[in-house]
Amino acid sequence: MPLKETTGKVVSDKMNKTIVVAVENRISHRKYAKTMIRTKKYKAHDENNECTIGDIVTIQETRPLSRTKCWTMVNILSKSFDN
């Protein structure tokens, strides 16, 4: 079974070796057919602490690393230039 991969934006990097990634998902309302954006936050493992807030990253599902962390950062697609 292939591992799940998804892309999102880093919204927090305050924890050591952990980032919080917000993943947006566009869905259509069943009754009204309006396109809505649902956002889900995932905690992901960042071994080298190389991500900053605003980066676009790819995360991959892995074994549970802690109570809330079961994703790992694969690569950084684009860096944030706010700093």
Curated annotation (Swiss-Prot):
Main subcellular localisation: plastid
GO cellular component, one term: cytosolic small ribosomal subunit
Gene3D superfamilies: Nucleic acid-binding proteins
Coiled-coil regions, chain positions: none
GO biological process: translation
Superkingdom of the source species: Eukaryota
One GO MF term: rRNA binding
SUPFAM superfamilies to which the protein is assigned, alphabetical: Nucleic acid-binding proteins
Annotated compartments: Plastid, Chloroplast
Keyword Transmembrane: no
InterPro entries noted in UniProt: NA-bd_OB-fold, Ribosomal_uS17, Ribosomal_uS17_bact/chlr, Ribosomal_uS17_CS
CDD domains in UniProt: Ribosomal_uS17
Keywords: Chloroplast, Plastid, Ribonucleoprotein, Ribosomal protein, RNA-binding, rRNA-binding
Family per record: Belongs to the universal ribosomal protein uS17 family.
Alphabetized HAMAP family for the sequence: Ribosomal_uS17_B
Quaternary structure and partners: Part of the 30S ribosomal subunit.
Known role: One of the primary rRNA binding proteins, it binds specifically to the 5'-end of 16S ribosomal RNA.
Record-linked NCBIfam families: PRK05610.1, uS17_bact
Name of the protein this chain belongs to: Small ribosomal subunit protein uS17c
Native organism: Pyropia yezoensis (Susabi-nori)
Source species taxonomy: Eukaryota, Rhodophyta, Bangiophyceae, Bangiales, Bangiaceae
